[in-house]
Amino acid sequence: MNDIAIDKEHLHYLEQLSEMYPTIGKASSEIINLQAILNLPKGTEHFVSDVHGEYEAFSHVLKNGSGAVRKKIDDVFGLAMNKADKAALATLIYYPREKMELIKQDEPDMDSWYKTTLYKLIEVCKTVSSKYTRSKVRKALPEEYAYVIEELITEKPEVLNKEAYYESIINTTVELGTAEEFIVVLSELIQRLAVDHLHVLGDIYDRGAGPHLIMDRLCRYHSLDIQWGNHDIIWMGAAAGNPACIATVVRNSIRYGNLDVVEEGYGINMLPLATFALKAYKDDPCTRFVFKVAPSGADNMESDLTVSYTHLRAHETL
């Protein structure tokens, strides 16, 4: 066999690979696996930009995948389901607990509704999982329901009477009283599988009241990348202790009525600053720093600061 010339750079990588795949069989198996993955449809990528701290709107966009979930419902049921029922199913997937509370008020036979709904969710779940390998789907499954969900969404040619097999699993779920929790789990799994990767483009922070909640949500997200915006950089600078960034963050938070982000979101006491401002600038109209929120919001914030200052003065005189 002829000697193959290998430069040092490539040799380093080959040595690393030889530790991961020490035999021809293991290397071949991995090549086959990767080639199979390349032949699967590309996972859905979701782009969101300029979130600006609006947590409720951002959360809703994540739940529906900017229409990706509704499209899957259309793909699965087509003309077999009318628009109203599709919209109701979509809402259930986005907000399962809240929707079920509303259903209970009008539905006389909840057990029947549970069974029908579970069948629908399983069909949607099969479709959204079809882009991925079994291994990837398995990793996305919640541990306590992993086996049952995998049984329901995986084709089993060895099972001759599939309908009876699925029906027995669903009936048992309803009889055990776990149907509601199972519906929540399936709904969240559909949300999870509908979007393979999230791209967040710029300005998580700014005017909205929930950027810290958005960051918490992103920390739990399965796959994402972030392109930071100028407002995000300012908050990073403030966290790092830069005086100019700190002043800008406080100024913006006050002008847009979002001091709760600083005080409740990050636990920073703003009362000393409010006390100083009320003393030092009590006769200054500060026209260059007027509120940009609605007048009622500005009045509420000013009232809160005044009450805090009054309480502080009362405490000092005791």
PLM features per residue range, with description:
Residues D50, D203, N230:
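Divalent metal-coordination and catalytic microenvironments
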Residues T310-T317:
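Conserved small/polar residues in nucleotide/adenosyl-binding loops
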